[in-house]
Amino acid sequence: MEKKLERKYGLFTAICMVVGTVIGSGVFFKAQNVLQATEGNMVLGIAAWVITGLLLIICSTMFSVMATKYEKVNGVVDYAEATCGTTYGYYLAWFMTNIYYPAMTGVLAWVTARYLGVMFGWSLVSAEVMTLASLFLIGTYALNAFSPKLAGKLQVSATVIKLIPIILMAIVGTIAGSSNGTLPANFAGAMDALSGGKAMSNLFGAVVATVFAYEGWVVATSINAELKNPKRNLPIALVVGALVVVAAYVLYFVGCAGGATVTELQDPNLGAPNAFQNVFGKTGGLILNVCIVISCLGTLNGLMVASTRGMYSIAARNQGPTPKVFAQIDETTNMSTNSSIWGLLVCCLWMVYFYGANLSSGWFGLFNFDSSELPIVTIYAMYIPMFIMWMVKEKDMGFGKRFVLPVIAIIACLFMVFAAVYAHGITPYQNAQADGKFSFPVAFYLVIYAVIMAAGAFFYKKNKNNIEA
């Protein structure tokens, strides 16, 4: 008789798991990006965090309903297969393996190195920081390959530690900023600048910037099989957990504004560490910076785990290039070594791209785009067919769950896609046109996306033909 997972988690544990999964290192460096996008407007910045949080709540609620229907499903690729079929599931898995996870992993390696480098006064684009980023990539790969238990302990420790700077900055920064006048000064004049197309353009850019900090919520639906009364508790856990995350991010953002001027927070070399040092002093700021580094390492470790398993998950379905090679499991480490090496190489390529496109003068010309944002928005676009097929297939669901909720989720995803096109297409196009140049990053990102997905199509069809032969 097949042994089933025990339903051992209650509602409170589920909420904690959602919060622990979603809250990550993105808030530490994206807070600066948000202010840069809004040109220092705190009101627009807060609006961006709230809007993206609302989109998170809508989509996570939709997935929670799907999770109660497909109780044996574990992971977004399985949801894709359940709703749209195995072919769509394969393409989503290919995208996540070769674009989504490695792009985020490459960025996180740099973010981790950047915050460690700040303590030594290194520039965020210095050779020292990039060398550290490379070492972090290789180090997390080695940790997962040779000591997965230790990697798991790092994950647990980082989950607790990453909450420390967020909570302290949210409380102490807000109090300090209110008493010394920094916080009111940062909000002064913000409401006056909210009218006009420029404000809307800035808001779209800020919304897309925040999406990195919220990513990871769909992983929380994987606890469905181990949750007591999942039909009741999972939707509540996702919504309440999401509200806690939104509140934490907004309060942290406000706390940072209480610890430093908007100009200081926009400083590309320091940003949030300015606020930490102003509020907690040099030593206190240094300690909190160490907490951020550990938090980033935990997130990087989690992303590396996903990156190294990607080709294995495809090969396990007898798909992709040479499934027998990527499906092999090392008897000593119980890891798919070939899949892990592929994941590491792709992560390194994306990190090099991120440096060349976003941190240097722009190595790739028209093909420069922000790899920390556009791949994440892409997955929202790829949710849309899943929601549509849910409405087509699930005839036994009530009207609200079959039509109303997925339609709202589709609108939320379309808004995110529109915001990305505006922020990474229309706005840079208008700015470049004013200088007599041309720029439309999102279009050239889609070219790269199409090429990588076409490679996936080649291997899918080739493998399918081999099976049929």
Task: Please provide the spans of the model-predicted regions.
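Juxtamembrane helix-boundary/capping and inter-helix hinge elements in multi-pass membrane proteins
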Residues: 36-41, 69-73, 82-88, 225-233, ...
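TM-loop-TM module centered on a large, flexible mid-protein loop between adjacent transmembrane helices
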Residues: 76-81, 85, 118-122, 239-301, ...
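Membrane-interface loop-to-helix entry segments
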Residues: 128-182, 215, 238-239, 378-381, ...
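Helix-loop-helix junctions that connect adjacent transmembrane segments
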Residues: 4-7, 46, 123-128, 156-289, ...
